[in-house]
Every structure is written in C-alpha cells, then in structure tokens.
Amino acid sequence: MIDCSFEINYLIKEDSVMVLYLKKNICLESLPKIKDIMFEYLSKSINNIILNLSECSFIERDIWNYFIDFKKELNNDCYGDIVLSNMNGIVQMDYDLMELSNSIESFESLNDALYNFGIFNHTKSA
C-alpha cells in the first residue's frame, strides 16, 4: 500500500499561469486540497495550470482521471489548459503506460511549460 503523504505548493506567474508543485504521493485524499487551490485562482481568471511533478513519486489513477476531465472542462468552458512538467520515475512510467500523452501534454522542464503559455523565463549565464 502506498503512503499517501503529500505536499502541494504553488505560485502564480504573470497573473496568468498557476504552477502547482505536487510532491510525494498524490492519492485521492489529496484531491480536495488540489481542487481548493485551483478553484480559488480559476475564480480570478487564472485558468492555465502547470503541474510540476519533479518531486512527485506517485499519482493515483483517479487523480490522473480527474486532471484529464478537468482539462476538458478548462478547454471547453474557460479557454484554459493543464500541462505537466518535470516528470520522472514511476510517474513517468504511469504516464507512458496509461498513454496519457493523448490527453495531457508534458514538457521536460518548467521553463518549457511556461513558454507554452507565452511566459519567457530569462536565465542569466556568467
């Protein structure tokens, strides 16, 4: 049985994109908190969401299904979108196994996902 300890952090980029950092194991018990955060900002017309999964170890199938259904709602009702960034390990294998690429787009990095929404992160190099 999977330990359903989870952490969720978020930030808003340029008043148009929410980046949700899902950490540890995301199980059905974590869905109310995820929904609360997303709906708070949807009411403020922030309807583009990036799920950053760099520190996520596991996502329960019901959560994947929720994100797929919610993406359809965003596309149809709010002209928004959900994308993924920084997947690795078991989360990446599940994404591939469940053929979720047909439903939710994935980006290798957060910068790539932000660029998808027209946000350019300028990185300075020495």
Describe the function of each predicted region.
Residues I2-F39, L53-E55:
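STAS-typified acidic loop motif
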Residues S103-A113:
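Short acidic-hydrophobic, aromatic-tinged amphipathic segments that line or gate anion-handling sites
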Residues L28-I104:
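Amphipathic alpha-helical interaction surfaces in cytosolic regulatory modules
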Residues L114-A126:
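A cross-taxonomic marker for long C-terminal extensions/tails that follow the last structured domain
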Residues N25, N88, L110-D112:
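Short, solvent-exposed coil/turn elements at secondary-structure transition points
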